[in-house]
Amino acid sequence: MDEDGLPLMGSGIDLTKVPAIQQKRTVAFLNQFVVHTVQFLNRFSAVCEEKLADLSLRIQQIETTLNILDAKLSSIPGLEDVTVEVSPLNVTAVTNGSHSETTSEQTQQNSTQDSGAQESEAPSENVLTVAKDPRYARYLKMVQVGVPVMAIRDKMISEGLDPELLEKPDAPVPNGESERAVEESSDSDSSFSD
């Protein structure tokens, strides 16, 4: 023992003389812990379930709104003949921010060269462009009207179309799709003639 009367080694208690822990008290503590843990987990699962239900409802509302918008746009007569020119300068300015000036000058030079090349190719071949294709024209019209591009991309993917062609309205329609579009347009023309 030191000068204060405290033991130098160990607790100084003879463990053989200490009474046993009361089992009822241990069981009560354990039961209280289990009850509180289960209540916490129940509250947590209820909150998670409520948030998931709210999110599911919002997704259904957005899907319904998108379907209504799609129906409204498809009911507009003459929408198939609309051609839309998307300016690459606007897209570059939005995506690159501070580098927009130098990039826009480069894209302007590239687009001038590309348009010159396309003008020389266009008369030599009768190519169906994205802007003239009725399947893509309605999506280009949606972009012009101001529908969010991500929603249009999702809709195009669901219909099996390439959403990258929204940015290139003067590009030729991919091979398989142009033949299908010509067949569909000829089928629709023949159905009107009957």
From Swiss-Prot:
Keyword Transport: yes
Example GO BP: regulation of Arp2/3 complex-mediated actin nucleation
The organism's place on the tree of life at top rank: Eukaryota
Parts forming coiled coils: 46-74
Protein transport keyword on record: yes
Biased composition annotated in UniProt, kind: Low complexity: 98-113
UniProtKB keywords: Acetylation, Coiled coil, Endosome, Protein transport, Transport
Record GO cellular component, one term: WASH complex
Classification via Gene3D superfamilies: 1.20.5.110
Entry-annotated residues carrying N-acetylmethionine: M1
Residue ranges, compositional bias (Polar residues): 114-126
Residue numbers spanned by region Disordered: 94-126, 158-194
Localization of this protein: Early endosome
Subunit structure of this chain's protein: Component of the WASH core complex also described as WASH regulatory complex (SHRC) composed of WASHC1, WASHC2, WASHC3, WASHC4 and WASHC5. The WASH core complex associates via WASHC2 with the F-actin-capping protein dimer (formed by CAPZA1, CAPZA2 or CAPZA3 and CAPZB) in a transient or substoichiometric manner which was initially described as WASH complex.
Family, similarity comment: Belongs to the CCDC53 family.
Function: Acts as a component of the WASH core complex that functions as a nucleation-promoting factor (NPF) at the surface of endosomes, where it recruits and activates the Arp2/3 complex to induce actin polymerization, playing a key role in the fission of tubules that serve as transport intermediates during endosome sortingg.
Protein name, entry field: WASH complex subunit 3
Gene source species: Mus musculus
